Protein backbone atom coordinates (compact mmCIF):
# COMPACT_ATOMS: atom_id res chain seq x y z
CA UNK A 1 0.00 0.00 0.00
CA UNK A 2 1.57 3.28 -1.16
CA UNK A 3 2.08 5.77 1.64
CA UNK A 4 1.97 9.50 0.91
CA UNK A 5 4.21 11.84 2.87
CA UNK A 6 2.17 13.05 5.81
CA UNK A 7 2.34 14.10 9.43
CA UNK A 8 0.29 13.86 12.59
CA UNK A 9 0.24 14.52 16.30
CA UNK A 10 0.08 12.04 19.16
CA UNK A 11 -2.30 13.17 21.88
CA UNK A 12 -4.39 10.80 24.04
CA UNK A 13 -8.09 11.58 24.40
CA UNK A 14 -7.48 11.77 28.15
CA UNK A 15 -4.98 14.60 27.61
CA UNK A 16 -7.42 16.95 25.88
CA UNK A 17 -8.42 20.12 27.75
CA UNK A 18 -11.64 19.74 29.71
CA UNK A 19 -13.40 21.31 32.72
CA UNK A 20 -14.51 17.85 33.86
CA UNK A 21 -11.30 16.24 35.07
CA UNK A 22 -10.21 14.36 31.94
CA UNK A 23 -10.21 14.86 28.19
CA UNK A 24 -13.32 13.48 26.53
CA UNK A 25 -15.54 13.64 23.43
CA UNK A 26 -16.58 17.21 24.20
CA UNK A 27 -16.29 20.42 22.17
CA UNK A 28 -12.59 20.57 23.04
CA UNK A 29 -12.05 17.40 20.99
CA UNK A 30 -13.75 18.96 17.96
CA UNK A 31 -11.71 22.12 18.46
CA UNK A 32 -8.53 20.04 18.46
CA UNK A 33 -9.55 18.45 15.14
CA UNK A 34 -9.97 21.94 13.68
CA UNK A 35 -6.58 22.94 15.11
CA UNK A 36 -4.93 19.89 13.52
CA UNK A 37 -6.51 20.71 10.18
CA UNK A 38 -5.19 24.28 10.25
CA UNK A 39 -1.76 22.96 11.30
CA UNK A 40 -1.60 20.92 8.07
CA UNK A 41 -1.79 17.57 9.81
CA UNK A 42 -3.26 14.34 8.44
CA UNK A 43 -3.32 12.11 11.52
CA UNK A 44 -4.45 12.26 15.11
CA UNK A 45 -2.86 9.35 16.94
CA UNK A 46 -4.48 8.37 20.23
CA UNK A 47 -3.89 5.71 22.87
CA UNK A 48 -6.22 2.73 23.47
CA UNK A 49 -9.80 3.73 24.28
CA UNK A 50 -10.54 0.80 26.60
CA UNK A 51 -12.01 0.82 30.10
CA UNK A 52 -9.10 1.44 32.45
CA UNK A 53 -8.61 -0.49 35.66
CA UNK A 54 -6.19 -0.29 38.59
CA UNK A 55 -3.15 1.75 37.64
CA UNK A 56 -5.19 3.69 35.03
CA UNK A 57 -3.24 2.26 32.08
CA UNK A 58 -5.15 2.11 28.78
CA UNK A 59 -3.02 -0.95 28.00
CA UNK A 60 -4.61 -2.89 30.90
CA UNK A 61 -8.31 -2.76 30.13
CA UNK A 62 -11.33 -4.68 31.38
CA UNK A 63 -12.19 -5.43 27.72
CA UNK A 64 -10.62 -5.50 24.27
CA UNK A 65 -13.89 -4.14 22.85
CA UNK A 66 -15.51 -1.82 25.40
CA UNK A 67 -14.83 1.92 25.55
CA UNK A 68 -13.87 4.06 28.53
CA UNK A 69 -16.93 5.80 30.07
CA UNK A 70 -14.61 8.56 31.33
CA UNK A 71 -14.54 9.81 27.73
CA UNK A 72 -18.30 10.34 27.52
CA UNK A 73 -19.03 14.04 27.13
CA UNK A 74 -21.00 15.36 30.09
CA UNK A 75 -21.97 18.42 28.06
CA UNK A 76 -23.65 16.13 25.54
CA UNK A 77 -25.61 14.49 28.37
CA UNK A 78 -26.67 17.97 29.52
CA UNK A 79 -27.92 18.69 25.99
CA UNK A 80 -29.92 15.45 26.12
CA UNK A 81 -31.55 16.58 29.35
CA UNK A 82 -30.32 13.71 31.54
CA UNK A 83 -27.90 15.95 33.46
CA UNK A 84 -27.88 19.65 34.30
CA UNK A 85 -25.00 22.06 33.83
CA UNK A 86 -25.21 22.89 37.54
CA UNK A 87 -24.76 19.24 38.52
CA UNK A 88 -21.67 18.93 36.35
CA UNK A 89 -20.19 22.22 37.54
CA UNK A 90 -20.71 21.27 41.18
CA UNK A 91 -18.69 18.05 40.83
CA UNK A 92 -15.14 18.21 42.19
CA UNK A 93 -12.75 16.74 39.62
CA UNK A 94 -9.61 18.23 41.17
CA UNK A 95 -7.92 21.59 41.03
CA UNK A 96 -5.24 21.13 38.36
CA UNK A 97 -6.09 21.81 34.72
CA UNK A 98 -3.01 19.89 33.55
CA UNK A 99 -3.51 16.78 35.70
CA UNK A 100 -6.00 13.92 36.02
CA UNK A 101 -7.10 12.95 39.54
CA UNK A 102 -8.32 9.41 38.90
CA UNK A 103 -9.68 8.84 42.41
CA UNK A 104 -11.95 11.88 42.16
CA UNK A 105 -12.80 10.98 38.59
CA UNK A 106 -13.94 7.49 39.63
CA UNK A 107 -16.24 8.91 42.28
CA UNK A 108 -17.59 12.02 40.57
CA UNK A 109 -17.97 10.79 37.00
CA UNK A 110 -19.42 7.52 38.23
CA UNK A 111 -22.05 9.38 40.24
CA UNK A 112 -23.01 11.63 37.32
CA UNK A 113 -23.15 8.78 34.80
CA UNK A 114 -25.42 6.75 37.09
CA UNK A 115 -27.63 9.80 37.47
CA UNK A 116 -27.80 10.19 33.68
CA UNK A 117 -28.71 6.51 33.29
CA UNK A 118 -31.49 6.77 35.88
CA UNK A 119 -33.09 9.59 33.88
CA UNK A 120 -32.52 8.13 30.42
CA UNK A 121 -35.52 5.81 29.97
CA UNK A 122 -33.05 3.82 27.89
CA UNK A 123 -35.21 0.70 27.85
CA UNK A 124 -37.54 2.42 25.38
CA UNK A 125 -34.77 3.71 23.11
CA UNK A 126 -34.82 1.86 19.77
CA UNK A 127 -31.25 2.88 18.93
CA UNK A 128 -30.07 1.42 22.25
CA UNK A 129 -31.91 -1.83 21.56
CA UNK A 130 -30.33 -2.06 18.10
CA UNK A 131 -26.88 -1.31 19.56
CA UNK A 132 -27.23 -4.08 22.14
CA UNK A 133 -28.35 -6.58 19.52
CA UNK A 134 -25.56 -5.68 17.09
CA UNK A 135 -22.88 -5.91 19.77
CA UNK A 136 -24.22 -8.73 21.93
CA UNK A 137 -21.28 -10.97 20.90
CA UNK A 138 -19.04 -8.97 23.27
CA UNK A 139 -21.40 -6.62 25.12
CA UNK A 140 -23.40 -9.24 27.04
CA UNK A 141 -20.30 -10.80 28.60
CA UNK A 142 -18.67 -7.43 29.29
CA UNK A 143 -21.71 -5.87 30.98
CA UNK A 144 -22.24 -8.96 33.14
CA UNK A 145 -18.53 -9.04 33.99
CA UNK A 146 -18.62 -5.43 35.21
CA UNK A 147 -21.83 -5.96 37.19
CA UNK A 148 -20.51 -9.09 38.89
CA UNK A 149 -17.18 -7.36 39.58
CA UNK A 150 -19.09 -4.62 41.40
CA UNK A 151 -20.99 -7.28 43.40
CA UNK A 152 -17.65 -8.80 44.45
CA UNK A 153 -16.35 -5.36 45.49
CA UNK A 154 -13.97 -4.98 42.56
CA UNK A 155 -12.08 -8.23 43.07
CA UNK A 156 -10.38 -9.78 40.00
CA UNK A 157 -12.56 -12.47 38.45
CA UNK A 158 -10.09 -15.22 39.36
CA UNK A 159 -11.03 -14.48 43.00
CA UNK A 160 -14.80 -14.71 42.48
CA UNK A 161 -16.94 -17.57 43.76
CA UNK A 162 -16.20 -20.75 41.83
CA UNK A 163 -19.60 -21.03 40.15
CA UNK A 164 -19.43 -17.65 38.42
CA UNK A 165 -15.64 -17.71 38.00
CA UNK A 166 -16.03 -20.90 35.95
CA UNK A 167 -19.23 -19.62 34.30
CA UNK A 168 -21.51 -22.45 35.38
CA UNK A 169 -24.88 -21.93 33.70
CA UNK A 170 -27.03 -21.71 36.87
CA UNK A 171 -24.72 -18.98 38.20
CA UNK A 172 -24.77 -17.11 34.89
CA UNK A 173 -28.58 -17.20 34.84
CA UNK A 174 -28.79 -16.11 38.48
CA UNK A 175 -26.53 -13.07 38.10
CA UNK A 176 -28.20 -11.97 34.87
CA UNK A 177 -31.53 -11.85 36.73
CA UNK A 178 -30.16 -10.50 40.01
CA UNK A 179 -28.05 -7.75 38.43
CA UNK A 180 -30.32 -6.89 35.49
CA UNK A 181 -30.25 -3.11 36.00
CA UNK A 182 -26.50 -3.04 36.69
CA UNK A 183 -25.94 -4.96 33.47
CA UNK A 184 -28.17 -2.51 31.59
CA UNK A 185 -26.28 0.42 33.13
CA UNK A 186 -22.98 -0.82 31.71
CA UNK A 187 -24.63 -1.38 28.33
CA UNK A 188 -25.94 2.18 28.46
CA UNK A 189 -22.42 3.52 29.04
CA UNK A 190 -21.13 1.61 26.03
CA UNK A 191 -24.01 2.88 23.91
CA UNK A 192 -23.23 6.50 24.78
CA UNK A 193 -19.49 5.95 24.32
CA UNK A 194 -19.89 4.54 20.81
CA UNK A 195 -22.50 7.10 19.80
CA UNK A 196 -20.25 9.99 20.79
CA UNK A 197 -17.02 8.47 19.45
CA UNK A 198 -18.50 7.71 16.03
CA UNK A 199 -19.75 11.29 15.80
CA UNK A 200 -16.31 12.68 16.66
CA UNK A 201 -14.52 10.35 14.24
CA UNK A 202 -16.94 11.26 11.43
CA UNK A 203 -16.21 14.93 12.09
CA UNK A 204 -12.46 14.33 12.02
CA UNK A 205 -12.74 12.42 8.75
CA UNK A 206 -14.85 15.21 7.24
CA UNK A 207 -11.95 17.58 7.97
CA UNK A 208 -9.44 15.24 6.33
CA UNK A 209 -8.06 14.02 9.67
CA UNK A 210 -7.58 10.27 10.07
CA UNK A 211 -7.50 8.55 13.45
CA UNK A 212 -4.62 6.23 14.32
CA UNK A 213 -5.89 3.90 17.02
CA UNK A 214 -3.72 1.79 19.27
CA UNK A 215 -4.29 -1.70 20.65
CA UNK A 216 -2.17 -3.74 23.04
CA UNK A 217 -1.20 -7.19 21.82
CA UNK A 218 -2.43 -8.74 25.07
CA UNK A 219 -5.64 -8.44 27.06
CA UNK A 220 -5.56 -7.93 30.82
CA UNK A 221 -5.92 -10.98 33.05
CA UNK A 222 -8.75 -9.22 34.86
CA UNK A 223 -10.84 -8.74 31.73
CA UNK A 224 -14.12 -9.92 30.30
CA UNK A 225 -12.14 -11.42 27.41
CA UNK A 226 -10.15 -13.82 29.61
CA UNK A 227 -13.19 -14.64 31.77
CA UNK A 228 -15.47 -15.37 28.80
CA UNK A 229 -12.89 -17.15 26.60
CA UNK A 230 -10.55 -19.10 28.93
CA UNK A 231 -9.79 -21.66 26.24
CA UNK A 232 -8.01 -19.00 24.17
CA UNK A 233 -5.49 -18.26 26.93
CA UNK A 234 -2.87 -20.21 28.86
CA UNK A 235 -5.09 -20.91 31.89
CA UNK A 236 -5.40 -24.13 33.92
CA UNK A 237 -8.60 -26.08 34.70
CA UNK A 238 -9.45 -23.56 37.43
CA UNK A 239 -8.88 -20.69 34.98
CA UNK A 240 -5.70 -19.57 36.75
CA UNK A 241 -2.79 -18.53 34.47
CA UNK A 242 0.09 -20.93 33.98
CA UNK A 243 2.33 -18.27 32.43
CA UNK A 244 2.13 -14.52 31.86
CA UNK A 245 3.60 -11.91 29.53
CA UNK A 246 6.53 -9.54 29.87
CA UNK A 247 9.93 -8.78 28.38
CA UNK A 248 13.40 -9.96 29.41
CA UNK A 249 16.07 -7.95 31.24
CA UNK A 250 17.93 -5.37 29.14
CA UNK A 251 19.90 -2.15 29.51
CA UNK A 252 16.78 -0.29 30.58
CA UNK A 253 15.56 -2.82 33.18
CA UNK A 254 17.94 -5.32 34.85
CA UNK A 255 15.07 -7.60 35.95
CA UNK A 256 12.97 -7.17 32.81
CA UNK A 257 9.32 -6.16 32.78
CA UNK A 258 6.60 -8.36 34.29
CA UNK A 259 3.35 -7.31 32.62
CA UNK A 260 1.19 -10.08 34.04
CA UNK A 261 -1.13 -10.47 31.03
CA UNK A 262 -2.33 -13.99 30.20
CA UNK A 263 -0.59 -15.47 27.19
CA UNK A 264 -2.51 -16.70 24.18
CA UNK A 265 -3.02 -20.39 23.59
CA UNK A 266 -2.02 -20.01 19.96
CA UNK A 267 -2.90 -23.58 18.99
CA UNK A 268 -6.52 -22.86 20.01
CA UNK A 269 -6.56 -19.68 17.90
CA UNK A 270 -5.08 -21.57 14.96
CA UNK A 271 -7.82 -24.21 15.25
CA UNK A 272 -10.49 -21.52 14.73
CA UNK A 273 -8.67 -19.87 11.85
CA UNK A 274 -7.72 -17.01 14.19
CA UNK A 275 -11.35 -15.93 14.39
CA UNK A 276 -10.98 -14.01 17.68
CA UNK A 277 -8.14 -11.93 16.24
CA UNK A 278 -9.96 -11.36 12.96
CA UNK A 279 -13.01 -10.16 14.89
CA UNK A 280 -10.90 -7.96 17.15
CA UNK A 281 -9.19 -6.22 14.24
CA UNK A 282 -12.44 -5.93 12.28
CA UNK A 283 -13.93 -4.11 15.27
CA UNK A 284 -10.87 -1.87 15.57
CA UNK A 285 -11.29 -0.76 11.97
CA UNK A 286 -14.89 0.13 12.79
CA UNK A 287 -13.45 2.65 15.26
CA UNK A 288 -10.18 3.80 13.66
CA UNK A 289 -8.74 4.52 10.22
CA UNK A 290 -5.30 3.07 11.02
CA UNK A 291 -4.40 0.64 13.80
CA UNK A 292 -1.08 0.50 15.62
CA UNK A 293 -0.46 -2.90 17.24
CA UNK A 294 1.68 -2.67 20.37
CA UNK A 295 4.54 -5.16 20.94
CA UNK A 296 4.38 -6.57 17.41
CA UNK A 297 7.43 -8.75 18.04
CA UNK A 298 5.21 -10.92 20.28
CA UNK A 299 3.64 -12.42 17.17
CA UNK A 300 7.03 -13.81 16.18
CA UNK A 301 8.25 -14.82 19.63
CA UNK A 302 6.72 -14.02 23.00
CA UNK A 303 8.35 -13.99 26.42
CA UNK A 304 6.72 -16.49 28.77
CA UNK A 305 7.13 -15.98 32.53
CA UNK A 306 5.90 -18.58 35.07
CA UNK A 307 2.79 -17.31 36.87
CA UNK A 308 3.62 -16.10 40.36
CA UNK A 309 7.12 -14.88 39.48
CA UNK A 310 8.12 -11.57 41.05
CA UNK A 311 10.30 -10.49 38.11
CA UNK A 312 10.83 -11.48 34.47
CA UNK A 313 14.26 -13.09 35.02
CA UNK A 314 12.90 -16.66 34.90
CA UNK A 315 11.08 -16.20 31.60
CA UNK A 316 11.89 -17.75 28.23
CA UNK A 317 11.01 -17.17 24.58
CA UNK A 318 8.33 -19.22 22.84
CA UNK A 319 7.25 -19.21 19.20
CA UNK A 320 4.24 -17.12 18.17
CA UNK A 321 1.90 -17.55 15.18
CA UNK A 322 4.04 -15.48 12.82
CA UNK A 323 2.85 -14.40 9.41
CA UNK A 324 0.13 -17.08 9.36
CA UNK A 325 -2.06 -14.90 11.60
CA UNK A 326 -1.82 -11.86 9.33
CA UNK A 327 -2.41 -13.91 6.20
CA UNK A 328 -5.67 -15.06 7.82
CA UNK A 329 -6.56 -11.47 8.77
CA UNK A 330 -5.89 -10.22 5.24
CA UNK A 331 -7.93 -13.01 3.71
CA UNK A 332 -10.88 -12.13 5.95
CA UNK A 333 -10.66 -8.32 6.01
CA UNK A 334 -8.63 -7.41 2.94
CA UNK A 335 -5.63 -5.11 3.13
CA UNK A 336 -5.89 -2.76 6.09
CA UNK A 337 -3.61 -0.03 7.37
CA UNK A 338 -1.67 -1.39 10.34
CA UNK A 339 1.42 0.04 12.03
CA UNK A 340 3.72 -2.56 13.58
CA UNK A 341 5.21 -1.38 16.88
CA UNK A 342 8.50 -3.19 16.36
CA UNK A 343 10.57 -1.44 19.04
CA UNK A 344 12.84 -3.08 21.59
CA UNK A 345 15.04 -6.10 21.00
CA UNK A 346 14.90 -6.98 17.32
CA UNK A 347 15.90 -10.41 16.04
CA UNK A 348 16.27 -11.35 12.38
CA UNK A 349 13.01 -13.30 12.54
CA UNK A 350 11.12 -10.27 13.89
CA UNK A 351 12.50 -8.11 11.09
CA UNK A 352 11.45 -10.77 8.61
CA UNK A 353 7.91 -10.86 10.03
CA UNK A 354 7.57 -7.09 9.64
CA UNK A 355 8.86 -7.32 6.05
CA UNK A 356 6.55 -10.21 5.21
CA UNK A 357 3.53 -8.39 6.64
CA UNK A 358 4.23 -5.28 4.58
CA UNK A 359 3.25 -3.13 7.56
CA UNK A 360 5.31 -0.01 8.29
CA UNK A 361 7.43 -0.29 11.41
CA UNK A 362 8.28 2.48 13.86
CA UNK A 363 11.41 4.60 14.11
CA UNK A 364 12.02 6.56 17.32
CA UNK A 365 14.63 9.32 17.25
CA UNK A 366 15.47 9.04 20.96
CA UNK A 367 16.68 5.48 20.44
CA UNK A 368 19.29 6.55 17.89
CA UNK A 369 21.70 8.07 20.41
CA UNK A 370 21.15 5.94 23.51
CA UNK A 371 24.15 3.87 24.66
CA UNK A 372 21.77 1.45 26.43
CA UNK A 373 20.41 0.38 23.04
CA UNK A 374 20.48 -3.34 22.23
CA UNK A 375 22.45 -3.03 19.02
CA UNK A 376 20.04 -1.47 16.53
CA UNK A 377 20.67 2.23 17.21
CA UNK A 378 21.67 2.85 13.60
CA UNK A 379 18.18 1.74 12.54
CA UNK A 380 16.84 4.81 14.33
CA UNK A 381 19.13 7.38 12.72
CA UNK A 382 16.88 9.41 10.40
CA UNK A 383 19.02 8.95 7.28
CA UNK A 384 18.29 5.20 7.57
CA UNK A 385 14.49 5.46 7.80
CA UNK A 386 12.81 3.56 4.97
CA UNK A 387 9.81 5.07 3.20
CA UNK A 388 7.59 2.34 4.62
CA UNK A 389 7.96 3.45 8.22
CA UNK A 390 6.45 5.83 10.75
CA UNK A 391 8.90 8.23 12.41
CA UNK A 392 8.47 9.51 15.97
CA UNK A 393 10.56 11.70 18.24
CA UNK A 394 9.29 9.54 21.10
CA UNK A 395 6.21 7.62 22.20
CA UNK A 396 3.95 7.69 25.26
CA UNK A 397 6.49 5.45 27.03
CA UNK A 398 9.45 7.76 26.46
CA UNK A 399 10.73 10.91 28.08
CA UNK A 400 9.71 14.11 26.38
CA UNK A 401 12.31 15.22 23.85
CA UNK A 402 13.42 18.14 26.03
CA UNK A 403 13.97 16.03 29.15
CA UNK A 404 15.53 13.19 27.19
CA UNK A 405 18.20 15.53 25.83
CA UNK A 406 18.86 16.88 29.32
CA UNK A 407 19.27 13.43 30.91
CA UNK A 408 21.38 11.53 28.37
CA UNK A 409 25.15 11.30 28.81
CA UNK A 410 27.43 14.15 27.75
CA UNK A 411 28.89 11.94 25.01
CA UNK A 412 25.40 11.21 23.71
CA UNK A 413 24.50 14.91 23.66
CA UNK A 414 27.67 15.49 21.65
CA UNK A 415 26.52 12.78 19.21
CA UNK A 416 23.20 14.59 18.79
CA UNK A 417 24.97 17.90 18.07
CA UNK A 418 27.35 16.23 15.63
CA UNK A 419 24.51 14.47 13.82
CA UNK A 420 22.50 17.69 13.55
CA UNK A 421 25.68 19.61 12.66
CA UNK A 422 24.26 22.26 14.95
CA UNK A 423 26.49 23.73 17.65
CA UNK A 424 24.78 27.11 17.97
CA UNK A 425 21.15 26.47 18.91
CA UNK A 426 20.63 26.76 22.69
CA UNK A 427 19.92 23.46 24.46
CA UNK A 428 16.40 24.53 25.40
CA UNK A 429 15.52 25.12 21.72
CA UNK A 430 17.26 22.12 20.20
CA UNK A 431 14.07 20.05 20.28
CA UNK A 432 12.86 22.02 17.26
CA UNK A 433 15.91 20.99 15.25
CA UNK A 434 15.29 17.35 16.19
CA UNK A 435 11.65 17.55 15.13
CA UNK A 436 12.68 19.06 11.80
CA UNK A 437 15.23 16.27 11.42
CA UNK A 438 12.65 13.51 11.32
CA UNK A 439 10.13 15.57 9.36
CA UNK A 440 12.62 15.70 6.49
CA UNK A 441 13.42 11.98 6.71
CA UNK A 442 12.25 9.54 4.03
CA UNK A 443 9.64 8.00 6.36
CA UNK A 444 6.25 8.41 4.74
CA UNK A 445 4.51 9.20 8.02
CA UNK A 446 5.83 11.32 10.87
CA UNK A 447 4.02 11.55 14.22
CA UNK A 448 5.12 14.04 16.89
CA UNK A 449 3.82 13.89 20.49
CA UNK A 450 2.07 17.12 21.42
CA UNK A 451 4.44 17.61 24.38
CA UNK A 452 7.42 17.68 22.02
CA UNK A 453 5.88 20.34 19.80
CA UNK A 454 5.32 22.36 22.98
CA UNK A 455 8.87 21.81 24.23
CA UNK A 456 7.67 20.46 27.59
CA UNK A 457 9.76 18.55 30.12
CA UNK A 458 8.98 15.27 31.89
CA UNK A 459 6.25 16.87 33.98
CA UNK A 460 4.22 16.21 30.81
CA UNK A 461 5.46 12.64 30.31
CA UNK A 462 2.58 10.22 29.75
CA UNK A 463 4.05 6.98 31.12
CA UNK A 464 7.20 5.63 32.72
CA UNK A 465 7.13 1.84 32.21
CA UNK A 466 7.32 -0.42 35.29
CA UNK A 467 6.07 2.36 37.57
CA UNK A 468 2.62 3.19 38.95
CA UNK A 469 0.99 6.21 40.52
CA UNK A 470 1.97 9.19 38.38
CA UNK A 471 1.32 7.87 34.88
CA UNK A 472 -1.43 8.67 32.34
CA UNK A 473 -2.18 11.96 34.14
CA UNK A 474 -0.93 14.81 31.93
CA UNK A 475 -3.46 17.11 30.29
CA UNK A 476 -3.07 19.84 27.73
CA UNK A 477 -4.19 23.34 28.65
CA UNK A 478 -6.38 25.03 26.08
CA UNK A 479 -4.14 28.11 26.17
CA UNK A 480 -1.23 26.00 24.89
CA UNK A 481 -2.95 25.48 21.52
CA UNK A 482 -1.83 28.83 20.17
CA UNK A 483 -2.10 30.21 16.65
CA UNK A 484 1.66 30.82 16.73
CA UNK A 485 2.43 27.14 17.36
CA UNK A 486 -0.17 26.08 14.79
CA UNK A 487 1.48 28.28 12.16
CA UNK A 488 4.95 26.97 13.03
CA UNK A 489 3.80 23.35 12.73
CA UNK A 490 2.09 24.07 9.42
CA UNK A 491 5.19 25.77 8.01
CA UNK A 492 7.49 22.87 8.91
CA UNK A 493 4.97 20.30 7.70
CA UNK A 494 4.66 22.14 4.38
CA UNK A 495 8.40 22.66 4.01
CA UNK A 496 9.06 18.93 4.13
CA UNK A 497 6.22 17.91 1.82
CA UNK A 498 3.87 16.56 4.47
CA UNK A 499 1.02 19.09 4.52
CA UNK A 500 -2.53 17.81 4.31
CA UNK A 501 -4.05 19.74 1.40
CA UNK A 502 -7.44 18.02 1.63
Question: Which positions does each model-derived feature cover?
Answer:
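Outer-envelope exported proteins of Gram-negative bacteria
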Residues: 47, 210-212, 216, 290, ...
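Domain-scale activation on soluble regions of proteins
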Residues: 38, 164, 171-172, 474, ...
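Catalytic domains of carbohydrate-active enzymes, especially glycoside hydrolases
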Residues: 27-52, 287-288
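Surface-exposed amphipathic alpha-helices with a cationic face
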Residues: 37, 197-205, 330, 354-355
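Conserved, well-ordered alpha-helix/loop/beta-strand core segments that scaffold catalytic motifs
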Residues: 186, 190-219
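N-terminal regions that are enriched for targeting/export leaders
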Residues: 1-14, 30
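Alpha-amylase-like alpha-glycosidases and glucanotransferases acting on alpha-linked glucans and related
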Residues: 12, 18, 56-191, 219-447, ...
Amino acid sequence: MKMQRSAGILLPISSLPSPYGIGCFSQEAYDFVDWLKEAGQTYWQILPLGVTSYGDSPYQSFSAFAGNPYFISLDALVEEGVLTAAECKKANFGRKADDIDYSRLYTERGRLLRLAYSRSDIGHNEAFTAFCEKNKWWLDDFALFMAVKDRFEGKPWIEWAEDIRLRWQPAMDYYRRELYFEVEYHKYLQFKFEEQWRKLKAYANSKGIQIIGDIPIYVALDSADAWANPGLFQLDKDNIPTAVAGVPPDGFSPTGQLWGNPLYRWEAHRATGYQWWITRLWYCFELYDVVRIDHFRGFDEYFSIPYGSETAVDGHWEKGPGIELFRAVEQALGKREIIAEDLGYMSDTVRQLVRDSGFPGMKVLEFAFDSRDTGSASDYLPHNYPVNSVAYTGTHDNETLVSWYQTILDAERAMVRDYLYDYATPDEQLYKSMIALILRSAAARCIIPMQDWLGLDNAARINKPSTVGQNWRWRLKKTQLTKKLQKEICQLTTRYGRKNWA
